[in-house]
Amino acid sequence: MMNKKRRKKKRVCQFCADKNAKIDYKSTQRLQKYITERGKILPRRISGTCAKHQRELTVAIKRARNIALLPYTLD
């Protein structure tokens, strides 16, 4: 048997691809995509964002949680 190496297609960061997309703590619909059903922030390898935008997302999600736009946990 031959072991075939699988090559995954490199995911492009959604925010790098769309220059008009801004990461804002007030846009809760966009931030909801990067939170699990338990309320945790998705890691880069799952969300597909670059390091720069992942940091910005984390800050925006934490700000939104702080002013009660997003919940800390989801039940």
From Swiss-Prot:
Keyword Cell division attached: no
Disulfide bonds: none
GO biological process: translation
GO CC term (a single one): cytosolic small ribosomal subunit
Keywords: Ribonucleoprotein, Ribosomal protein, RNA-binding, rRNA-binding
GO molecular function, one term: structural constituent of ribosome
Lineage: superkingdom: Bacteria
Protein family per UniProt: Belongs to the bacterial ribosomal protein bS18 family.
Quaternary structure, from the entry: Part of the 30S ribosomal subunit. Forms a tight heterodimer with protein bS6.
Summary of the function given for this chain in its UniProt record: Binds as a heterodimer with protein bS6 to the central domain of the 16S rRNA, where it helps stabilize the platform of the 30S subunit.
Name used for this protein in its record: Small ribosomal subunit protein bS18
Species assigned in the record: Clostridioides difficile (strain 630)
